[in-house]
Amino acid sequence: MSGGLVTLGETMGLVAADGIGSLEFARGFAFGIGGAESNVAIGVARLGGSATWIGRVGRDATGDLIERRLRGEGVRATVIRDSSFTGLMVKHRRTAGLLHVDYHRAGSAGSRLVPADVPAAAVRSAGILHVTGITPALSGTARETVFHAVEAAHAAGVTVSVDVNYRSKLWSSYDAAPVLRDLVTRAQVVFAGPDEAELVLGPGGNPAERLAGLGPSEVVIKDGARGCTALIEGERHAVKALEVTVVDPVGAGDAFVAGYLADRLAGAGPAARLGTAIAAGAFAVTFPGDCEGLPTRPDLESLLSATDNVSR
């Protein structure tokens, strides 16, 4: 497939507390970046694909970091500097099995996206436009921007990929459902978890088949430790998850999407795409941070060929 990935959304600073327990007792913190769309862009770039990210950041040190990190990862970054602040998320483990994330993003630079921020030439030249259900929740103008980009992709004959990515801290299911359903109907490729599919469709039935009934030709249901199921051009697929030691589950879904889309851009078939997606998601959760664990091709080869925990 000619062209690369183009995506747009909000990337934030990420403060992650060390250890396990209440945030007030944390002994140290790591600072990085995170955002679903930029995670996918970085993931595609690390797997050898071309990726472009479009978004707003503040005129602050966190905005500087985001721009440097994206470009350092080989992502083509269209960064619009805004007078508002760069958003922030704070992540800590209350218990070994409970991860808690707080967002400080209302009114942030990233939420102030407008349709004019999206370069028409970037969309026209893309192989895939990838958007998520997070950005439409940020503001009215951000929602307009997502649908503007999707319509521009349609006009140019560019494949549209949507990750439903419902965030209950950003909007209610009542407000989200019709918007997410509208996005799904405009996509050729859709990713969703079982609960997200139910949010869009209501309960009952096979989620992949029902989402495909809205128009997409490729529907992938991400189901964590259970692996994934998919309906791709009418063919059913199921792939088991790989068993790994989970360090940080955040970012696994983005790694999965990046693996699938990177292989799709490279011309791989459905089975190969899903296998890469599963492996990328598994590799990502073995690292702390949102994007630090996104794998390279050699990383995936090592994971899939490993018979023990020693690299020789």
Predicted feature descriptions by range:
Residues 1-5, 151-155, 203-312:
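Conserved phosphate-binding/catalytic region of the ribokinase-like
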Residues 1-75, 97, 311-312:
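Glycine-rich phosphate/adenosyl-contacting loop at the front of the ribokinase-like
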Residues 18-28, 131, 235-245:
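Glycine/charged-rich beta-loop-alpha catalytic/anionic-binding loops adjacent to active sites
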Residues 42, 88-92, 227-230:
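Short beta-strand scaffold segments in enzyme catalytic cores
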Residues 44, 193, 253:
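Short, conserved phosphate/pyrophosphate- and ester-handling motifs at nucleotide-, phospho-/glycolipid
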Residues 50-133, 302-312:
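Conserved N-terminal subdomain of the carbohydrate kinase-like
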Residues 128, 134-210, 226-228:
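Conserved beta-alpha-beta core of the PfkB/ribokinase-like small-molecule kinase fold
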